[in-house]
Amino acid sequence: SGLKTARMLKREYGIPYETGYPVEAESRREFMERILPELGSHTLIVHQQIFANEIREWIREQKPDAKVTVAGWFRMDGTLKEEGDRHLEEEADLLKLVRDGAVDTVLGDPLLKRALPGWQGTYLDLPHYPVSGELHSVETSRDYWKKAGHRR
């Protein structure tokens, strides 16, 4: 993510840095218009940490008292975590976090819905390339395999 390099530049040369995820204003507005009406009292964002943190901030700009937790299977930097944020080790950790944390809304890759059997909350699709790869860039399974170079 570049954090290691940014921290070295800060330490060695005093160059300040900030974390964030650049998104065009129009794309951000459209995204927020789509998700805000669907958010419950406790939202869990399952994604890459810096992007998830950015979405958390967007939500709080509109709903200052919103309870928003970030979780993911990929490395999470401790200095960028808030209380309640979690690094997940396995799929069962996601279901446990949702149930134990009384989460009523999840933003995550569509494939992760399967890891929440019986959960009755609102699931909002937020594709994550390392989870589902090319699946969201094609219409059918046949298109996927064709794009992957298989001829069947």
Question: What residues fall within each predicted segment?
Answer:
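An N-terminal assembly and electron-transfer interface module characteristic of large anaerobic redox
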Residues: S1-R152
